[in-house]
Amino acid sequence: MACAICTLRRPRRFCPGVRGDICTICCGTEREVTVACPLDCEFLQESRKHDKPAPIDPEQVPNRDIRVSEKLLEQNETLLAFLGGAVAKAALDTAGAADRDVREALEGLIRTYRSLESGVYYDSVPSNLLAAGIYRAVERDTGEFRRQERENTGVTKTRDADVLGCLVFLQRLEFDRNNGRPRGRAFLSALFEFYGGSPSASPPAASSLILP
């Protein structure tokens, strides 16, 4: 019996991503590269503890002109948690979606909310079909969040600028957590832990993601 990936070495563990037994070398080299690893895979979760994302060059981070202050995040804590959960759910419900697709969806959403701020609305749907699906789902859920807020309070509390700021924060978190693998979902793992109900998770430190 040989590894289901390389067909050469002896398999040492079961891989839920390929639904077969694989060797430890292929597990390490093909993880989130050619294999779409389930987020609950024990070997993937263990590898997360040793991930070392490349340092972020602040000059390469998009939307630097949008200031995301700790005060804004504190005042919109409920909105941020909602958006984080909405992005995670939309991506996890989209078969084949990885962090890079979420990055495109977030950029499209940010462009759309930028246009709302300018007074000239433009729906910036990504051309990438996976990213477009995530974009549409988050856009729909955000509209529902604001509708329910108006019904419950009688006023429109959440501004377009608030949504924009929270989206930019999530975009910076994606840049911080993305491990660069083609099928990587380290950012989605973080979102699921922070905003998906994991009892052991702690939210990301805002100060580390706020650009000077």
Which role fits each region the language model picked out?
Residues 1-56:
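N-terminal cysteine/histidine-rich coordination modules
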Residues 36, 40-212:
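Long, charged interaction segments in nuclear RNA/chromatin-associated proteins
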